[in-house]
Amino acid sequence: FPTRRSSDLAICKAGMLFITLPSGRSLSYVRPRLTQNRFGGESIEYLGIGPAKKWERIESYGPKFVENIVQGISRDLLCEAMLKLRDRRIVAHVHDEVIVEADLETPVQEVCDAMAQCPSWAEGLLLRADGYECSYYRKS
């Protein structure tokens, strides 16, 4: 990934924390604030939808933000792959998988090659895709 200053990646603006992903898309956190957690350490709280399906303050910490960033980048990579496969009949996607309904003559490797193409915003990232043929969906 291209090197950027950390000050370019996260910004607080108008009561929101925006974390910019390499794709240019942003993760958004509503009304963030630094707080002290139950162990006496520093944590970050923001407004989000809680288990009761109502707005509430959610406590988070560094590794959780890293997890959100990794999941966001993974989602962006999957979307890029799906755009490359838009001429195929994508019937579903599950996490990092694309499920394509295709003629028996369609080579699986063709779909794998499309998924392994690195987007310009992730230049240098090593991608590989594995695939298989079956007559119904199953987890490999």
Q: What are these model-derived regions, one by one?
A:
Residues R4-S140:
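Conserved catalytic core of nucleotide polymerization and phosphodiester-bond processing enzymes
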